[in-house]
Amino acid sequence: MDDTLYVCTGHSWVEAIDAATGKIKWKYDPKANTGPDVYLACRGLAYYKAPEGASSECPERIIAPVLDARLMALNAKTGKPCEDFGDHGFISLTQYLGHVPDGFHFVTSPPMIISDRVITGGWIFDNQATFEPSGAVRAFDPVTGKIVWAWDVGHNPQTWTPGPNDELTRDTPNAWGVYTADPKLGLVYLPTGNAPPAYFGGHRRPFDDKSSSSIIALDAKTGELRLHFQTVH
């Protein structure tokens, strides 16, 4: 952005680098839990400029995944956490997932920002068990960090806003990779995997089979399904 490169490291550090000189302007360490069951990877981060007057503290922010299933917002100029986002700059992505064993859910891909939404899924540990955490995709307010919608294939309706004590459907297909979007259409495109475990599907439910191995397009603002194309039946 402008004269600054923003990068993330395998340990979830975020650094701002002067694009001309290569000097580090600032770096931030979120003190991520990097235990033995966590992949040390970060595929990217996102930039968001808040509408005028929406945030005096962090008008420009970097929103990045943290290995231990958190999402953080940092001031793009200083690297300090945005206090108005979630809990002092962080939101926990394990909320609404029920019991999550260590290393069973984390995010390595950049969140997608479109239509004033921060949209992210997550990686679910393959081939470990059934009754694993949900693969639902969620959208958050980029200023406050509050959840706006969740796309949960096992829920009726599939798009809903979970409350503090709600749990998203377990064992559903996840979309852990890099998303793409079309701002003109207001759509976000998700590549889905399979419901866990990866290599046996005899127990899978009809909604698992329908949404596995698919390209999904959702209305970024509302989370409503707009397109579903299954690549493998």
Residue ranges and their predicted role:
Residues 1-11, 38-70, 103-130, 134-136, ...:
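Repeat-blade elements of multi-bladed beta-propeller folds
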Residues 14-35, 39, 47-49, 53-55, ...:
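Extracytoplasmic/lumenal domain signature
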